[in-house]
Amino acid sequence: SDSYILIGTDEYDEKIKTFFSILEGEKKLQNNKFFFEEILPQCFAQYKFWKLMSQTQYESYNEILQTMNVVVEFDRDNSDYIYNRTDLQNLPGKDFHKKKNLVNAFLKNSNISIKNLDTTNTKDAFRILQIWSENRNLKQTDYYQCIDALNDISQNNSILSGIIVYVEDNPVAWSIGEFLPDEKTYLVHFEKGDSNYKGVYQFINNATVKNLPETVLFINREQDLGDEGMRQAKLTYRPCGFINKYLAFKK
């Protein structure tokens, strides 16, 4: 298929500056003179950033972009964290000792059950989201994106999958993600839990991975968006690598 452009902005936060991202089909852009002379200048005139540029795009187009007075910078805040499935599933060694202890603390609850997230239980997931959302500035969270994802699942109209955890029939946590085309990587989009249950987030992280097919070898837990607390939390799970992203803008 031809290359195509995805234009986007965050409709939930007026402070987010507009950006565009480019998704490529089988026909690459490198030799597309019309794109670089006509389309891309229009994008930079209308939007402030080319966001989520991939490593391959950076290596392919950086020289061309320099001739257009476009600056490309490494975007650490939007680079994805990649983990070995076995690490998140088994929590081995001293590095994961605290995580395993918290999982075990959650397991002390009685009558824990795990179900696939589907049309029959999204109402329970919404209850958890509501508990999680209390006393938060929702515009600075992924609350609205979670609503969209849950609505898609509730309408059985989604490539997303997930699980929901119950303690004595009370919903306490859920996660949503999707399988990437290589089928070896699972991309985790959202995790939400009732923090009144000790270890709930460590458990939902671990349970999500344990419920995946054995063919999945890697877990992509997305970016930290520059949030220092989120960054430290993601680093404590010992990523095996990153998917680098770049940001481009006109001088």
Language-model features: locations:
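A short helix-loop-beta-strand connector motif used in the catalytic cores of GNAT acetyltransferases and
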Residues: 1-3, 152-163
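Short, glycine/charge-rich beta-strand/loop segments that flank catalytic centers
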Residues: 47-65, 77-80
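Aromatic (often tryptophan-rich) hydrophobic motifs at membrane interfaces
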Residues: 161-250
